[in-house]
Amino acid sequence: MTKPYLTVDNLINEDVGLNVQGLRKVYKSRLALMDFSIFVTKGEVVSLLGPNGAGKTTAFNIIAGMHRSDGGSIKLDGNEISTLPTYRRSKAGLGYLPQESSIFRGLTVEKNIDAILELNIRSPKERRKKLEELLGEFAITHLRNAKALNLSGGERRRVEIARCLASKPKYILLDEPFAGVDPIAIDEIRELVRELKNRKIGILITDHNVRETLKIVDRAYIINDGKIIMSGTPDYVINDQNVRRVYLGDKFAL
């Protein structure tokens, strides 16, 4: 049996973690987001999906702190972060992995990770310990001296996620994790998402690869014309006739 449509109101007495309520964004005379509300709990994998131009990128950029909204609120474990820049949101526990490569291409894998650790751990001994842990956990120890520009798509994503974890996030925004990677790398990314979930990190994903995304999420939000039109488990949302009409099509199946 599939779960019903879910809203923040259903969980009002629970710790909803990343809680986005009533976002509104206007570009000139065009309303890009209207009453946009979503939530992500700890250890939950959630996707934001919809047609091109539906408002996914706008919403994601606002949540990440790259753009300001014209209304609404963003809270992280009860703390208001709506006005904080991206780096302050990172320190508060909200990590962000953009679609574009976020690693320093001219540096080695080891130096890429250590650059983030230096911002968060003062003790050289503790930094070295954490560096070795991250290299081992993401199976990139053998790549420690490799330049980032020589990495494959899957290897690059592992390094980027290891870098992200160096700042100890509670929640992570994943922008197009399946874009531009081969089938083997897709399997690796699925495994990485499972690992993050096992660490009780909440994850919000947006991606054009709908099928692969829905295979790994606990819940999905569907946005169209700047509004959330449906949310729930993958099985629930893909069987909604309105979602099929505006986004998935009649023949879509997982």
State where each predicted segment sits.
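The feature captures the beta-strand-to-loop junction immediately N-terminal to the Walker
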Residues: 49-51
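Conserved ABC ATPase signature
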Residues: 147-151, 155
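ABC ATPase NBD coupling module
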Residues: 68, 80-100, 105, 124-128, ...
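Helix-to-loop junction immediately C-terminal to a conserved catalytic motif
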Residues: 64
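Conserved ABC ATPase "signature" region
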Residues: 114, 125-143, 191-194
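Conserved catalytic motifs of ABC-family nucleotide-binding domains
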Residues: 168
